[in-house]
């Protein structure tokens, strides 16, 4: 059976309503998608890192409960598992504050088993982070050599929009690795200053990857190929 392998950050989200803690749940861009697949019974592995602490235990237990393999999760002894505080307004929109304390050596995990036509998912700032880039490229090269389908979701948020020009070479390299690129109109507005999906595809994506999916909230989905 085809497997899905993802790489990215997982973080414990502590959610506040009316300035009071309401609940705490692990989250993350790639992580959330893999959790949904695990609940459906799809064979899923997640490459990530958490601290050797109580928060790390919570995250790993949550993964196991939702059928995600923890074999490729690095438990670093130095530093602490990342957390975020999510303050919800009356419309349930969140304002985030992040707390991270990673060690110098990161993602100290073996290469996962990948077979032809397995799906390898990568994205968000985690795939662009200079501190992780060399290791990220190792995984991308390996997935491509193993003939996996590489699926890239930039998940490029407004908080990083001011870095778009600086990160452009790495973004384009991620485009080159991808067999499928999927993102929201907001992602590409933050990257290119352009939300028109056809122009984004024609001017920025098609040269690197000809399979392109954009989402528009209530406005639906566009597919280009």
Which stretches of residues belong to each language-model region?
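Structural motif
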Residues: 3-5, 118-119, 180, 211
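Glycine/threonine-rich flexible loop motifs
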Residues: 18, 22, 128-134, 161-164, ...
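Conserved N-terminal subdomain of the carbohydrate kinase-like
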Residues: 43-124
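Active-site beta-loop-alpha junctions enriched in small/polar residues
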Residues: 101, 125, 155-159, 186, ...
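Anion (oxyanion) recognition and catalysis
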Residues: 38, 64, 141-145, 175, ...
């Amino acid at each position: 059976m085809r497997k899905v392998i993802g790489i990215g950050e997982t973080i414990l989200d502590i959610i506040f309503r009316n300035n009071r803690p309401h609940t705490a749940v692990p989250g993350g861009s790639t992580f959330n998608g893999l959790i949904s697949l695990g609940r459906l019974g799809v064979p899923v592995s997640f490459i990530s890192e958490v601290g050797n602490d109580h928060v790390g235990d919570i995250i790993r237990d949550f993964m196991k409960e939702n059928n995600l393999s923890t074999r490729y999760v690095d438990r670093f002894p130095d530093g602490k598992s990342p957390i975020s505080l999510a303050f919800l307004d009356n419309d349930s929109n969140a304002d985030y504050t992040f707390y991270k304390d990673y060690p110098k050596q990161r993602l100290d995990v073996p290469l996962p088993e990948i077979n032809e036509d397995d799906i390898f998912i990568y994205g968000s700032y985690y795939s662009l982070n200079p501190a992780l880039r060399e290791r990220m490229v190792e995984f991308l090269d390996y997935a491509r050599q193993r003939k996996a389908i590489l699926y890239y979701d930039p998940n490029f948020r407004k908080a990083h929009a001011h870095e778009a020009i600086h990160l452009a070479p790495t973004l384009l390299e991620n485009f080159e690795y991808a067999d499928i690129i999927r993102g929201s109109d907001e992602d590409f507005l933050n990257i290119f200053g352009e939300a028109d999906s056809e122009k984004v595809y024609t001017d920025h994506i098609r040269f690197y990857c000809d399979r392109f999916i954009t989402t528009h909230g209530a406005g639906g989905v566009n597919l280009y190929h």
